[in-house]
A protein has these predicted regions:
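Short amphipathic alpha-helical interaction patches enriched in hydrophobic/aromatic residues
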Residues: 29-33, 52, 71-79, 96, ...
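Short alpha-helical hairpin
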Residues: 12-26
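Generic alpha-helical secondary structure signal
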Residues: 16, 20, 63-66, 108, ...
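His-Asp-centered metal-binding catalytic motifs of divalent-metal-dependent phosphohydrolases/nucleases
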Residues: 59-78, 84, 88, 109-119
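An active-site-proximal "capping" alpha-helix that borders the catalytic cofactor pocket
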Residues: 44, 84-96
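Hydrophobic, well-structured mid-protein blocks that either form specific transmembrane helices
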Residues: 95, 102-130
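Divalent metal-dependent phosphate-bond-processing catalytic cores, especially two-metal-ion Mg2+/Mn2+ enzymes
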Residues: 12, 29-56, 68, 121-188
Length: 188
C-alpha cells in the first residue's frame, strides 16, 4: 500500500532484500516531519541501490543505512534539528541489533547514517556512506526537493522570501528565516 509507484522488489539486491523490514521501518517514520517521511526513505533507498549497484557497494551496509538514515526526525524538525541525531542513531542501533546483524556491519551502517547529512558538512570516508549522502542530496533536488523545502518551511513558520532581496544578491542566504534562501544555501 505505502509503496505507491515503487516496486518493493526493485529495492532488493543480490546481497540484501529490505522487503521484510519495510512494514516495521514504515512505522518508525510515522512521527517524521513531511520532508523526512517514509516516502523520502523509499526514494533515497531506491536511488542508493541504483548508485550502489553501479559502484559495487556493499548492499548489506548501504540499504539498511538508507532505510534508517533519518530515524529520529520529528514533525516540524526540518533543518532546525539534526534528523539523524544521537536518538536516531540509538534507535537505528537497537533496530539492527534486533535483526541479529553483527557488530561490524552495524557499525558500518551507523557510520553511514551518522555522516550522511548535508548540514554536518562531513565528507564520508566509506563508499557506502558517500553513496547514501549523494542519494539523500539527490532527493533534495527537482520538484520533490522544492515540495520538501516549502513543506518544512511552512511547518516551521518561515517567511517565503526576503522582501528587499529575494535572490540573495546583496546578502548572505539565511534559510532559517526565509524558505527561498534554502536554494542558495544548499541546492544551487
Amino acid at each position: 500500500i505505502y509503496l505507491q509507484g515503487y516496486n518493493q522488489l526493485s529495492m532488493a539486491s543480490d546481497d540484501f532484500d529490505p522487503g521484510p523490514w519495510l512494514d516495521e521501518i514504515s512505522s518508525l517514520y510515522r512521527k517524521a516531519d513531511p520532508a523526512h517521511d517514509f516516502s523520502h526513505i523509499l526514494r533515497v533507498c531506491n536511488m542508493a541501490r541504483k548508485i550502489g549497484q553501479e559502484e559495487k557497494a556493499d548492499m548489506r551496509v548501504l540499504l539498511p543505512a538508507a532505510l534508517l538514515h533519518d530515524l529520529g526526525s520529528k514533525k516540524g524538525a526540518g533543518s532546525e534539528q539534526e534528523p539523524s541525531g544521537q536518538a536516531g542513531l540509538g534507535a537505528a542501533r537497537a533496530f539492527l541489533q534486533g535483526k541479529g546483524l553483527g557488530r561490524d556491519r552495524i557499525e558500518k551502517v551507523l557510520y553511514a547514517v551518522e555522516v550522511h547529512s548535508f548540514s554536518r558538512g562531513v565528507r564520508p570516508v566509506t563508499l557506502e556512506a558517500r553513496i547514501l549522502q549523494d542519494a539523500d542530496r539527490l532527493d533534495a533536488m527537482g520538484a520533490i526537493g522544492i515540495a520538501r523545502l516549502f513543506v518544512t518551511g511552512g511547518a516551521l513558520g518561515r517567511e517565503m522570501y526576503h522582501l528587499q532581496d529575494p535572490f540573495c544578491r546583496e546578502r548572505e542566504p539565511d534559510d532559517k528565516r526565509w524558505n527561498l534562501d534554502h536554494f542558495y544555501r544548499k541546492l544551487l
